[in-house]
Every structure is written in structure tokens, then in C-alpha cells.
Amino acid sequence: MEITLFDPIDAHLHVRENALLKAVLEYSSEPFSAAVIMPNLSKPLIDTPITLEYEEEILKNSSNFKPLMSLYFNDGLTLEELQRAKNKGIKFLKLYPKGMTTNAQNGTSDLLGEKTLEVLENAQKLGFILCVHAEQAGFCLDKEFLCHSVLETFALSFPKLKIIIEHLSDWRSIALIEKHDNLYATLTLHHISMTLDDLLGGSLDPHCFCKPLIKTKKDQERLLSLALKAHPKISFGSDSAPHFISKKHSANIPAGIFSAPILLPALCELFEKHNALENLQAFISDNAKKIYALDNLPSKKAHLSKKPFIVPTHTLCLNEKIAILRGGETLSWNLQEIA
């Protein structure tokens, strides 16, 4: 059995910086045509010059790959700065509630504050797409749900602003997407295939720790259903986020799952298992092209076949290991060729 996926798109990707970027970027830039690049670096991408500098670093270390750059939402994003960004081809804003995830200490503390709403108004005028890490302070399994009132306010106040709920993790968010025309979402491999049991049902597995948390069986099944039918308001976004094993095995474990090396084979395996391979093309590419109005992307054909693929346990960067999701396991699909 074989399948060819055309122009795969990752609508949510972390490729880090410097040596780590060089170590992990190829896992995404080779099989994917494009990816929405997250701006929460150690020095966040708060303006156009910094963002373009980072884009150049990505382009220098890849080929036939389009990084879709995003700005880190902040009060300094004036109308003039947003116009400057748009003129340079930047079309995404990423809003992080303060302290909710990695490098979100510079995030937005008042989500409905006057300055936040002013930036959103200007973003709507200029046709930006708003990507939201949709969590608010509260019980860990309810953080996404607790953000619903903010998302509804955004959707109603800015009806022409396209809003993406990043890495959807709570089944209760599905109704929100179906209620508002301008609300969309991305789904990760881990949220549609894993539950809290994978994280802490046996021994604690730090390599399955992410934000938002993988949740209950009900959440996983409902989200998987969206993916399997390639719901038109949903696109694939891996949220692949590498960390060194030395940090993952520390007393202060960073959130993030490095899934990039297995994405296409694992998705083929999952969709085939549920007799939905015919919908994978829409989930992995077609929906994103429509939602984000993407064109003139690098052409890619990812050829996969149903042959065993033993997942490496890790990759290396500066003699440090980075654990790969499902490392040591054998997947039933293998990425054979990229053309």
C-alpha cells in the first residue's frame, strides 16, 4: 500500500535557534512545503527586523521550504509596525497569555485590555491571522475551556479577523469553532493520538509533557474525529518542540514534544487504522491552503509506503540528545521519497 501527499503544511512549528535549529530543521523542511514558525524564542520575535533575521536563518539552513513567519503579540505592534510586517510578507500574529507556556513570560497579561484590543483592531484592518495559545490560569485540565470567553469576545468584536485556536486539546472547544465563522483550529499528532495515560499512567514520561496538556480519552477521541474527517476549519499543526534530554530529565521539565521526525508516517498509520487515508491530504495540506490563503508554495510530493519504520530514539545536537516521540517503536508506514 502506498500514498503520495502533496505539499504537506505544518501550521504550527518550533525550530528553535542556532545549533539546535540546524539539528532539527531538516526533519520539517525536507518533507513539508511550508510551516507556520512560532516566535517564542529566547529573544521573542516582537518586530519586523528581528523576525526577518530569523527567517533568513531558516532559509539559509533549508531549501525548497517556505517558513511562514509570525510576530510575537505585544503592545509595541503599532499600526505602522504591522504595516511594515505585512509589506515584508508576514501575515501571522501569535498571542501568548503571560506565563502559559515556554518563553511566554513576555506574553499578554490583559487579554481584553485596551491596548490588546487596539492591536487586534489594526490586525483586522490589515488582514492578519491571529494564532492564539488559548489557555488561561486555572486548573490544568480546564485552562483551554477557561479561555473560551476571551475567544468569543475576540470572535464577536473582530468578525473579519481570522482567529486560530492553536493545538486544540479540549473537546469542549469544538462547539466554539462551529459557532463562529472566524474561529478555526490546528490539531497536533499528540493530541489526537495520546492521553494523560501516556504521560503519567505508568512511570512519568517527561517526553510526553506538553502545553496544553494531552487530556482525557474523550478529548482525544473527539479531536481525532475532527482530523479523520478533515473538518474544513481544522488544519494540521504539529507543535513539534524539541528540548535536550538533559532538560527533559531535570527537576524543572520544559513543555514540548519533538514529533517532527515521525509526523507523516505516524499520521498515515493513524488514518489507515481508522479507514480515513483518503482524508489525510486535506488534513495535512488542502485545509491549510484554504484557511490561510496560501499559494506559490514550494512543490513537494511525499511518497510513503506501508513498510516498517523503526523510530530512532533520539537525534543529536552538540553531543546532547533530543528524544523523538515514539522512539524505539516500529511504525507501519515509512517515508520513502520526497520529490
UniProtKB/Swiss-Prot annotation:
Requisite cofactors = Zn(2+)
Reaction catalysed?
A: (S)-dihydroorotate + H2O = N-carbamoyl-L-aspartate + H(+)
Which residues are noted in the entry as Zn(2+) 1-binding?
12, 14, 94, 239
Annotated metabolic or biological route of this protein: Pyrimidine metabolism; UMP biosynthesis via de novo pathway; (S)-dihydroorotate from bicarbonate: step 3/3
- Any idea of its EC number? 3.5.2.3
An example GO CC term for this entry is: cytosol
- Establish whether keyword Oxidoreductase is in the entry: no
Q: How is the cofactor bound?
A: Binds 2 Zn(2+) ions per subunit.
**Binding locations of Zn(2+) 2:** 94, 133, 167
Q: What are the recorded GO MF terms, alphabetically?
A: dihydroorotase activity; zinc ion binding
Question: Which positions carry N6-carboxylysine?
Answer: 94
Which residues are listed for substrate binding in this entry? 14-16, 40, 133, 243, 255
Q: Which family does it belong to?
A: Belongs to the metallo-dependent hydrolases superfamily. DHOase family. Class II DHOase subfamily.
Query: Per its record, how is this protein called by name?
Result: Dihydroorotase
List the source organism. Answer: Helicobacter pylori (strain J99 / ATCC 700824)
